[in-house]
Structure formats: C-alpha cells, structure tokens
Amino acid sequence: MNYQDNSLKSLKLGQKTEYASQYDRTLLQPVPRALNRDGLGITQNQPFTIGADIWTAYEISWLNEKGLPQVAIADIYLDYQSQNLIESKSFKLYLNSFNQSKFTDFNAVQQTMQRDLIECAQGDVKVRLNPVAVYDAQKIEHLQGDCIDEQDIEITSYEFNANWLKDCVSDEIVEEKLVSHLLKSNCLITNQPDWGTLHIHYVGKKINHEKLLRYVVSFRQHNEFHEQCVERIFCDLMHYAKPEKLTVYARYTRRGGLDINPFRSNFENLPENLRLARQ
C-alpha cells in the first residue's frame, strides 16, 4: 500500500491554511478509495454490498438575502461505491467558506453542498440540512449489543495485528451484536488520535470475545482514515471468522465540527444517523 501517493501529498491536512471568506467549492479535496482498497485486494469487488460514510456537520452557517446569519446541522451520506472519500479538513474549510456568503434559503445551501460533494466524491451523496430545532429534540442513543470491553485481560502490545483473529471462532452458530468503545486509531496524515465506538452485527460461527477485543485494541497506534479502518475490520472478520452475514459500523467522536461514521454491511440497510454519548 503506497501512502506516498500524490493524492495524499497535496492534502491540506496537517498544513497551515487560511480560511476562505466566501463560498469556494474548490476547497474540497478527494482521497481515492483505491489507496486503501488496493492493499486489501477489494478495489474491484468489495465484500460489502451496502455502505456509506455518514457525516454529521455541526458548524454550518451562511447569510440570508438580507445578510442575517443562518445556522444548520447536516446529515451527509457518502456512498461506499464513490470513487473518492472526502478529506475531512478540506470539508471543514469548504463548509467555513459559506459563512459570509448569501443564499436564498436552506434548500439552496443543501443543493449546493450536494452538487459539490457529488463532484468531489465521484459518486452518490445525499445531504440533509436540518434546523437546530431538529437536533434539540434528538436523544443521546446507544448502539444495541453486548459490550466486550469489561474483560479481565492483560494487554501488552498496541501494534496493529490481524492475527489476533486467528482461530477466533467456535462451531456454535449464533447471531450477535457486539459493541466496543475502545476503538482508537490515528489520522493517516497528522497522527492525531481518532476515538470511536465499534458495532459488529454478524450471523455465523461464534467469535471469541477476547480475541476480538485484542484485535480492536491493536488499532491503538495504527494510522488510517476512519473509513479505511472500518473496511479493514470488515475484511479481517470475513477472512478469519467467515460469517454468513456481517455489518461493521463505527461512530467516531467529533473533530472540527464534524463526526464521521462509516457503515459497511452485506445484509443490512443503512441506519438513520444518530448521536452517541461521546458525540
């Protein structure tokens, strides 16, 4: 996997940047999904058939035609089959460029964002712009399943190691939903920590919870984007556990007014966006 690709070298992430005072769609920067999928051997055929990068954008503002500031929160679904993912700092800079620009109404802003994101991602993107009142009524949710974090085990290594999943299943066939709040990886470019809650829903041979937890913890010093981590977890579970059905879903904490929540499945529909306690 060659992370020195020119598409990474040109990213604004980790560089000192200035904030645009007027709307500028050219601030958006794509990252080819193939950069990570080539290494996983899934560029042409992905083992998941349903998926999206689900973003929540909390810091959106623009001016109405009379110059009065408006604010909103956006739910954004970026299809897993898009050619590119969107680099998060460039997305933040792009959203900030709306701050001093005039738009006629919510719909004009929503349509503008959707058009620009589709062009950058080279794939399907859905944008829903919400008034703040919608989120005032939103409850803090939790992901349903058995939490695997309270095991009395000793951890001595924090280097990524997929081999923790070797021989991880028994002969018992089950349907399980498992949750871990201990997912932590690091940004591919800046090395900043990314904190997430991981949800795994599968049907197949029962996965050993200790081996799974050790595997999750091994991401602690691993450098990849959120979306790439989730696809790696999906591929590793398919390789070692070989479930009949599998969903991998991670909800990461907010940074720069954005949270990113990748969802990949071979049997479940996309979830409604929600908000966890750490979000």
From Swiss-Prot:
Primary subcellular site in the record, as a coarse category: cytoplasm
Entry keyword annotation includes Oxidoreductase: yes
Catalytic reaction list: 7-aminomethyl-7-carbaguanine + 2 NADP(+) = 7-cyano-7-deazaguanine + 2 NADPH + 3 H(+)
Top class in the EC scheme: oxidoreductase
MF terms (GO), sorted A to Z: preQ1 synthase activity
Protein function: Catalyzes the NADPH-dependent reduction of 7-cyano-7-deazaguanine (preQ0) to 7-aminomethyl-7-deazaguanine (preQ1).
Protein name: NADPH-dependent 7-cyano-7-deazaguanine reductase
Gene source species: Haemophilus influenzae (strain PittGG)
Gene name in the database record: queF
